[in-house]
Each structure stands twice: as structure tokens, then as C-alpha cells.
């Protein structure tokens, strides 16, 4: 390779949407015929006006619609080349994370339990010292530690969205 040559690699497609349509009822479609490829090591934003189906599409990607009877998803969604319907939903949800515009805490869980929810859902055991470190570091990193450090046992709904 010469100093002036450029080495390029083709990025790997990690998520593929193939003609995806989502229906809330047989008469009402929320998303119609969406096809896209999402590549490894890239950040992708789904943008559009309110009510156009952004959140609906994201929920289909991580199989949240299966929790609600009557919602139908057509087309194919492939995660790392495999149909998401052939994978355990929890595996899909671990692989396809989402950040919504207005995330909400679990209202019946304490602030501390909300912070630790990812560890618990993934079966990761931590010592009391590790838990304290995770809570402190996580809440400091988002600027909430000083506000909640004395109320970690209070419900997550205590936190304001504003």
C-alpha cells in the first residue's frame, strides 16, 4: 500500500428493514412499506413529524408490539442477518437499544432500582459496594446525584420530566 492510497472497508449491515408495515387495526396502518439498512458503528436517527410512526417502527424493531394484542407487523426485520422473530425477544432487546425523546422511569420502582434495572434484567449480580458505585457514577454522569442522593429509595415517579 502506498502512502497516498486509501484503504476502505464496506460497513456491515446490522439491521435491515424489508418492506415493513405496521397495523394497529386491520384498517389503520401506522407505518407503510419502510425499507432501510442500518450499518455497524454508525448512529442513526429516525426523524419526522409527530404521529408519523417513528416510535411505532422502533417498537417493532425490538418486538415490543408483541406485548399488545391486535398490532400486526408485516415485512421482515433482520438483526445481524437473522429474522428477529426467530430470536428470543430479550436477546433482540439487548441487541437493539433505543433512546426515546422522553424516557420514563418505572413508576413503581425506586430511583435506585430504576438505575439498576439493566443489571437485574440481564441477570448480572453485583455486590453492595458495586451497586453503590454504579448508582453514584450513573447519577453523577447525568447530573442527578445531588438532587436524589438522599432519596434513592423513593419511587421513580418522584423524578420530574421537566
Label the predicted regions.
Residues 70-72, 83-97, 121, 128-129:
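ABC ATPase NBD coupling module
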Residues 45, 59, 76-77, 90-104, ...:
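ABC nucleotide-binding domain signature
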Residues 76-83, 120, 128-150:
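Conserved ABC ATPase "signature" region
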Residues 9-14, 22-33, 65-70, 86-88:
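A short, flexible loop at the N-terminus of ABC-type nucleotide-binding domains that lies
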Residues 17-20, 29-42, 75:
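Conserved beta-strand
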Residues 47-49:
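The feature captures the beta-strand-to-loop junction immediately N-terminal to the Walker
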Residues 58, 108-118:
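Short coil-to-helix segment of the ABC ATPase nucleotide-binding domain corresponding to the Q-loop/switch region
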Residues 153-162:
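Conserved ABC ATPase signature
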Amino acid at each position: 500500500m502506498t502512502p497516498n492510497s486509501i484503504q476502505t472497508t464496506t460497513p456491515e449491515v446490522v439491521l435491515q428493514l424489508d418492506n415493513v408495515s405496521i397495523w394497529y387495526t386491520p384498517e389503520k396502518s401506522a407505518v407503510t412499506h419502510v425499507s432501510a439498512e442500518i450499518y455497524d458503528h454508525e448512529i442513526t436517527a429516525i426523524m419526522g413529524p409527530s404521529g408519523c410512526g417513528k416510535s411505532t417502527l422502533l417498537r417493532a424493531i425490538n418486538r415490543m408490539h408483541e406485548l399488545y394484542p391486535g398490532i400486526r407487523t408485516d415485512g421482515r426485520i433482520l438483526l445481524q442477518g437473522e429474522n428477529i422473530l426467530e430470536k428470543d425477544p430479550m436477546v433482540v432487546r439487548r441487541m437493539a437499544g433505543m433512546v426515546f425523546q422522553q424516557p420514563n422511569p418505572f413508576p413503581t420502582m425506586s430511583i435506585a432500582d430504576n438505575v439498576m434495572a439493566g443489571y437485574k434484567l440481564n441477570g448480572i449480580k453485583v455486590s453492595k459496594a458495586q451497586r453503590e458505585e454504579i448508582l453514584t457514577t450513573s447519577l453523577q454522569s447525568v447530573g442527578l446525584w445531588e438532587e436524589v442522593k438522599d432519596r434513592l429509595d423513593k419511587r421513580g415517579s418522584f423524578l420530574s420530566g421537566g
